[in-house]
């Protein structure tokens, strides 16, 4: 078993990605052909569940782009289900300390290394037990990325980096800026200083730093500092802003929804 994304990070090859929030296998396949190294299937802020994640994994599978899946929380039951449907690389949100990082790793490993439940006869990941020795190979193929998104997590970064089985640390600029008192302004100088310091610290520890940044100049700056997995856009944003720009070029006035109140 191989994990091409994990291998690329270990080799120090920067991986450029795109965030998928449309929660749709058709759009996932369309974007899988765009050439990105990785695609993030978002189960935290997009309307995904195990079934929709599965269909997107199936849609991406024929293409070189590598899927990364973000569960809604650091929950061993949800992690187990995502691994069974075929996710190999997980981005675990809102990890605050080393204990939570260790729990994330344990959820991805079969015993005795972890607590992942054994259900390979039912699992797409094992090709329904058609992969010889899957139970003994799976642990090494898992790639665990944890998100640090608060001042507390930043203060615990050194101990998080010491956790065995953590392959990368992703800095969440939106939540971090909010926690630092600059909600909606991840480009604030104090936030940027925290991000840049974290990237250098993560790389120095031999782990892969990652981030989502649609600002092209900043994304390139993070890559120069040593970031190894950088998402440079979001599908919903590309569609929304692209559609608005096209309408504006033809003089169409932007209108708010006609619905009033909750709909």
UniProtKB/Swiss-Prot annotation:
Q: Which residues form the active site?
A: 45
Asked whether the keyword Methyltransferase is assigned, the reply is: no
Q: Which pathway does this chain act in?
A: Aromatic compound metabolism; 4-hydroxyphenylacetate degradation; pyruvate and succinate semialdehyde from 4-hydroxyphenylacetate: step 7/7
Q: Where is this site: Increases basicity of active site His?
A: 84
Under Enzyme Commission nomenclature, its number is 4.1.2.52
The record's listing under NCBIfam families reads: HpaI (TIGR02311)
Its assembly, as annotated, is: Homohexamer; trimer of dimers.
Q: What's the protein called, per UniProt?
A: 4-hydroxy-2-oxo-heptane-1,7-dioate aldolase
* Organism of provenance: Salmonella newport (strain SL254)
